[in-house]
């Protein structure tokens, strides 16, 4: 979800959902904003308790998201930042993180909020971090999307294996 045309769903009661947030540690200022946005969404959706787990970097998000999924959480939100440098490393990390998180979602039938910023520079990340003056709040958006997806799956009678 990005910029113009993004949905603005009204928060629904998700107090019955078990939620875990896994967050990378690189780019502290941006990560603090993403985590704060996720926590605002959890409050808006009436999720009283959640688990926050920190990992070193974005690459580690998928394996920890999978471990949390196996602990019977209804929702996992993954937050991280990858900023393009001068080597192909950016492309490999972004692809691996995306594919890993999609695998967790599909293999576990579990909503995984994708709050991983893949940016060309620091300013793009700051603009999306939900900080004062930011244009977007991707931590909030990723959490909201995952919660709404979990609610939809519950309404469909779908449960994780």
Curated annotation (Swiss-Prot):
It is an enzyme of class 2 (transferase). It comes from the Bacteria. (2S)-2-hydroxy-3-oxobutyl phosphate binds at residues 86-87, 128. The keyword Transferase applies. The active site is at 89 (proton donor). Keywords: Riboflavin biosynthesis, Transferase. One of its GO terms (biological process) is riboflavin biosynthetic process. It catalyses: (2S)-2-hydroxy-3-oxobutyl phosphate + 5-amino-6-(D-ribitylamino)uracil = 6,7-dimethyl-8-(1-D-ribityl)lumazine + phosphate + 2 H2O + H(+). Belongs to the DMRL synthase family. This is 6,7-dimethyl-8-ribityllumazine synthase. It comes from Nocardioides sp. (strain ATCC BAA-499 / JS614). The gene is ribH.
